Amino acid sequence: MAAGVPCALVTSCSSVFSGDQLVQHILGTEDLIVEVTSNDAVRFYPWTIDNKYYSADINLCVVPNKFLVTAEIAESVQAFVVYFDSTQKSGLDSVSSWLPLAKAWLPEVMILVCDRVSEDGINRQKAQEWCIKHGFELVELSPEELPEEDDDFPESTGVKRIVQALNANVWSNVVMKNDRNQGFSLLNSLTGTNHSIGSADPCHPEQPHLPAADSTESLSDHRGGASNTTDAQVDSIVDPMLDLDIQELASLTTGGGDVENFERLFSKLKEMKDKAATLPHEQRKVHAEKVAKAFWMAIGGDRDEIEGLSSDEEH
């Protein structure tokens, strides 16, 4: 494994579905390139994440069991994807044995995967309760219930959701593209919220973005209606220091694409990420959604585009 290359550690706690099969699903091919290691049991699959915001070279590292995790692997883990057999009532027991390592790594992305929840084994409620308790996201590869076609805010499911989550992560070796309006997506990955702004592209070239000097006024104007639920939620979370953070982030996001600007952008993202990490997991998502709304309005976004962003609001 090349030194300094971050990895998404992939493992399976099922005897009928391997970590390598999960990687095949993620990469969308059975013709995989694998990096040879001294330990044949551990396999590294190079993957270049290339989207409109950034590119990053990472490894999908398949580790069959926790005893094969070396210090080098542990230092490189920035995402954790684990498959379990939901048809077995004890299906989560093996996954739980990985928790001490996951807590040591503290990856931003942690995904619990199964084919689909099972009433005869691990049902949806039990799986969701486990995920909430331990900070994971549940993804079913073949869910019985798919999002309705007329849903204005459809959630991604299956492998698509796994790929989406890995794309949303801010990898340590990320190379930003010259796109000046990627801030909202970066904030989503920073704070852990899994929503997008409706079904629209978060970056609108024609969308007017305000300079930092005017951002505070814009944010204040958007908050005008005290009876508005969304505004009330934003007001309840934006304290003076956080408000300053949002304004600086907005300024950096809408500023020039030079290296110094991006370095400061990621430094600020890291600071805000560390602050969010101090919150209990149950509160982090709510915090993320509220901060995301305030930030979106701070860069001149249209509030109508974020109506219904919160998971607890009616769509």
Curated annotation (Swiss-Prot):
InterPro entries, per the entry: Alpha/Gamma-adaptin-bd_p34
Expressed in which tissues: Widely expressed, including in skin and keratinocytes, with highest levels in adrenal gland, rectum and thymus.
Gene Ontology CC entries for this record: cytoplasm; cytosol; nuclear speck
Chain spans, region Disordered: 197-234
Modified residues (Phosphoserine): S310, S311
Location in or out of the cell: Cytoplasm, Cytosol
UniProt KW keywords: Cytoplasm, Palmoplantar keratoderma, Phosphoprotein, Protein transport, Transport
Entry superkingdom: Eukaryota
Gene3D superfamilies, per the entry: 3.40.50.11960
BP GO terms, sorted: protein transport
Disorder noted: Keratoderma, palmoplantar, punctate 1A: An autosomal dominant dermatological disorder characterized by multiple hyperkeratotic, centrally indented, papules that develop in early adolescence, or later, and are irregularly distributed on the palms and soles (other palmoplantar keratoses have mostly diffuse hyperkeratinization). In mechanically irritated areas, confluent plaques can be found. Interfamilial and intrafamilial severity shows broad variation. In some cases, PPKP1 is associated with the development of early- and late-onset malignancies, including squamous cell carcinoma.
Protein purpose: May be involved in endocytic recycling of growth factor receptors such as EGFR.
Subunit structure: Associated with AP-1 and AP-2 complexes.
Protein name: Alpha- and gamma-adaptin-binding protein p34
Source organism of the structure: Homo sapiens (Human)
Chain's gene name: AAGAB
